[in-house]
Amino acid sequence: METMQLDDTELRETAKQLYESYSTVLSESKLASILQDALGDFAPVLDSKYAARKTINNLVMGYYPNEATIKANFIDKVLFPLNPANISIFELPIGNSRVDMCKVNGHSAAYEIKTDLDTFDRLDGQMSDYFDVFETVYVVTSEKRWQELPSYVPDACGIYSYRQDARDGSYHFKAQRRAIKSTDLDSEKQLMVMPKRALCETFGISGKGMSKPAIVQECLAENGQAKINRLFKAYLKQRYGAYWEHFCKVKPQVFGIDYEWFYRNRLEPGIVY
């Protein structure tokens, strides 16, 4: 590819620019124009149906290690090869936070991604929210930063590090510390994740004329922590199972830069690409 005539610094800047201009729903001709504007004389010949989209994806995935890039690689290398019965969820709101990825089956796990573009300043609040709701919690960060994490996260928090191979741009993940399963979950916070209708259906409450907080209090009064945790996990699987199932089906046809978009929208790649 002629873009390799650019040095690494130029490629990183170009990849950042392309990511900021990119949208999954843009046409191939529009993407070709964006690519031409960014690369100028270094733009490659676009001689196939998805050439512009593929080139942008490859540059972003290889030279701009932001959250979307790391998340896509973490899915490919860590989450996807696990038990196929696991349901993974993108960007789930929890308390005052939004967890980057979580998975649920027999047990629940949260994964917070901190790239080299991020600070660790928000981890205190995020960890508080995640440990209240999920049985295990992990933070994913770069190989050069992971040893700083123990100062920011509880001892029970697991740690994954990632590094990028300088030869081919591929990412490699390593479990640096195993998460310890939490036994002190906040049932009220779990219930608040669920919408009012799901609470009523799951716990057999009519809910008529009741506010959501009142329904939550009734659930707490009539059910123990273990049962609420079990039903909370069952709700997540039921609510997001179709999203993950569709994503798994279309994943081989989808570029990494578009993973989250196709997960959320559940469309066929042929309609968009």
Region roles according to the model:
Residues 91, 162-165:
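Conserved beta-strand termini and adjacent loop/short-helix elements that scaffold enzyme active sites
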Residues 117-163:
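Catalytic cores of nucleic-acid endonucleases
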Residues 62, 66-105, 153:
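Active-site metal-binding core of divalent-cation-utilizing nuclease and nuclease-like domains
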Residues 168-240:
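A conserved mid-domain beta-alpha-beta active-site/ligand-binding segment of alpha/beta enzyme cores
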Residues 56-62, 73-74, 78, 179-181, ...:
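Eukaryotic low-complexity, intrinsically disordered regulatory segments enriched in serine, proline
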Residues 226-273:
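C-terminal, charge/polar-rich interaction regions
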Residues 101-103, 107-117:
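Conserved catalytic cores of phosphodiester-cleaving nucleases, focusing on short active-site segments
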Residues 1-64:
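Interdomain/boundary linker segments immediately adjacent to catalytic/signaling cores
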